[in-house]
């Protein structure tokens, strides 16, 4: 029965594509029908298998595709752990999708194949066809790269890393380290851009990334970077950053320190040169995110989530001047009426309304050892946020490793399932806030779903 469903759906989408091709060469006599057909697309669901512990996702990644119509149909059921396509990756794969959903991009994470880039044509079900050639970015950014697909028409990917080295003044006695004095920590950023269409390395640069002299003297340094985002002009990249600190007196890690304003690295694109660091006075903590894209371009500005803020996560705004707009104050604690909101993954539709996964201080730890998560609908212009009540929550449902939402017009598709338990795809109409329960997601012990593409 499932195979029949898959074959018919594949044939249906293929015929739809043929009809669209023919309609482009003839007079448009039925625009309503054409627009309706263009709304259909593949939705790919990713499932992360347990390794040693529930929810660790270290047992590998499987993907399964269904049409957007079937994803919205709660009578459908898919079992990616049993019938999915195994994505090459030693641990949880880092996935991206083309804007139309027809291509999946993967860079293997860790292990012997870590850093290998590959892409697949989506054909439905477990049928993903490798296309193009593979290329490794490991020589540039290591075998466990943090990478993202830029929103430039599916042309470019970008991966980053940062390495650090504490620096000391030896007081003129290079052979005696007892009188050495800590001065600062050197942070070296590497970034590689990847031609996604032709599987080629486009550019690679390494640069020193500095904070203010005062911040560095106090022991602060950039320790992790992630999630490059292209600005509206296409001439700057914004890279999220996390700060760490050492005690200048001992050069030992300092875990009890003042959290500084959120920071972002800005560098020229496509040259990848001239990095500078900008700071927010609205949000504090980190901007590098974790597994999902943490900042998005909307209406000429880039909107970015922060994490680790003692006042809860904010949505921050970087305007066309490539600086934080500190007049834009969007506190999720205030909007949601919670304390300690922490953004796990979010994604806006083109209308500036977004679905956001979060936890807060009231979340209880589940079987994975991580706190329960929730979903909210937020509005970037109105600066409002409302918890989505059409989704069943329970303590074992957490989104710490969540990677992606699928956007289809004003609809946003998400996966929601507790660790080790069945769940469903849910579709959020961002215009109305309505939530539609979609296809069932069949789970297995200790495993979880990490998003839709």
Locate predicted features.
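Acidic, serine/threonine- and glycine-rich low-complexity intrinsically disordered segments
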Residues: 205-366
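Intrinsically disordered, low-complexity segments enriched in Gly and acidic/Ser/Thr residues
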Residues: 314, 322-421
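Bacterial Sec-dependent N-terminal signal peptides
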Residues: 1-46
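Short beta-strand elements that form the blades of beta-propeller/WD-repeat-like
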Residues: 39-54, 100-111, 155-175, 235-247, ...
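Beta-propeller fold detector
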Residues: 72-85, 126-140, 193-218, 274-283, ...
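Beta-propeller blade signature
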Residues: 59-70, 117-124, 178-200, 251-272, ...
